[in-house]
């Protein structure tokens, strides 16, 4: 025994990536997926864009799915269905329950509909009861105060509910281990832009080390 609390054995990494075009970005996303063995890729609009371009998303969907990684599009169930993505990630908003209903109708019972509850316990419970495939909790700016709040929410949720909890919008990689210790089923990290595939591989290795996915086998 050590003095460290073992991480939840099922804690896994997910990646969040901007939907950019070109082979260079595809190579970076592929490198991140390979180095982390991420189980889910969430595609979000490119910086400055309000929607996801289907033509830019399609090659990223294909490269991830070839790696047995589920792909979700942020807030666009129709495009997700149209390009063969696995589902949608709904970001936190006032009408999140309505958005969930629309997305579920669009994708059907077999599509993945994950929801971001922000810091709202009420939204989390309502969406979990409605049938969301996971509930994500965010952390604001990612400082220590926000980390405390996010950790508390995940610990509360994991003790009471069976719907998977996702630690979303995670700040520094150093926060990963603590969130896993609190009971997060998935840890979602954003793939940095403006770096080489080699630098991304190093970043990814640090994320894997932080989450200690295979800690229980040690």
Model-flagged regions — what are they?
Residues 30, 101, 155:
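Active-site phosphate/pyrophosphate- and oxyanion-stabilizing loops and adjacent acidic/basic residues
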Residues 74, 116, 137-138, 168, ...:
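Generic beta-sheet signal
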Residues 108, 147-161:
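Conserved catalytic cores of soluble enzyme domains
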Residues 139, 155-170:
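Catalytic-face loop-and-helix region of soluble metabolic enzyme cores
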Residues 1-89, 94-95, 106-113, 119-132, ...:
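Conserved N-terminal beta1-alpha1 strand-loop-helix module at the mouth
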Residues 47-50, 54, 142-150:
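Glycine-rich tight-turn/loop motif centered on a GG-T
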């Amino acid at each position: 025994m050590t003095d460290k609390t073992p991480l939840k054995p099922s804690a896994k990494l997910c990646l969040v990536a901007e939907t950019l075009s070109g082979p260079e970005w595809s190579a970076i996303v592929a490198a991140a997926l390979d180095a982390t063995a991420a189980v889910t890729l969430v595609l979000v609009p490119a910086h400055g864009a309000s929607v996801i371009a289907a033509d830019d998303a399609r090659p990223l969907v294909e490269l991830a799915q070839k790696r047995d990684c589920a792909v979700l599009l942020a807030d666009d169930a129709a495009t997700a269905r149209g390009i063969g993505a696995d589902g949608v990630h709904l970001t936190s908003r006032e009408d999140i329950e309505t958005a969930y209903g629309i997305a579920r109708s669009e994708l059907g019972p077999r599509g993945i509909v994950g929801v971001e509850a922000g810091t709202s316990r009420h939204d989390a419970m309502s969406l979990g009861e409605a049938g969301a495939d996971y509930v994500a909790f965010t952390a604001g700016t990612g400082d220590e105060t926000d980390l405390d709040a996010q950790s508390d929410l995940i610990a509360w949720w994991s003790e009471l509910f069976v719907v998977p909890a996702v630690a979303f919008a995670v700040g520094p990689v150093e926060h990963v281990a603590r969130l896993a210790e609190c009971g997060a089923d998935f840890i979602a990290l954003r793939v940095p832009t403006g770096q080489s595939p080699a630098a991304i591989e190093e970043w990814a290795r640090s994320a894997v080390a932080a989450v200690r996915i295979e800690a229980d086998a040690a």
